[in-house]
Amino acid sequence: MSVHDEFDAEYDEAIDPDDLDDAAGAARAQAVTDFLARELVEDVDAIDVTASESRGEVTLLIHASPQDLGRLIGRRGRVIQAVRQVARAAGAADGQRINVEVAE
């Protein structure tokens, strides 16, 4: 069993996809962002995605280990831009505005 198989089994237990269908846009976006961040980095235990709301917009802050920041951001910010687009799409289903930032 590979590391990814073990992680997939653990992640499947933590978030039931059926629960996401009824979740609010912000919760769905947070779950999707957490999943994507964990798939991109080596130190999955260091990933923590926190949400805060201000003026009708939810900001998701991704905390990662310093050695994984480059993987999470990508060249010219392309990876984090893709994560932002997916998170925004997940939130848009319920009309929620989502912003994704990376903690340094």
Question: What is the predicted role of each segment?
Answer:
Residues 1-69, 82-104:
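RNA-contacting regions in translation and RNA-metabolism proteins
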Residues 73-77:
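Glycine-centered tight-turn and secondary-structure capping sites
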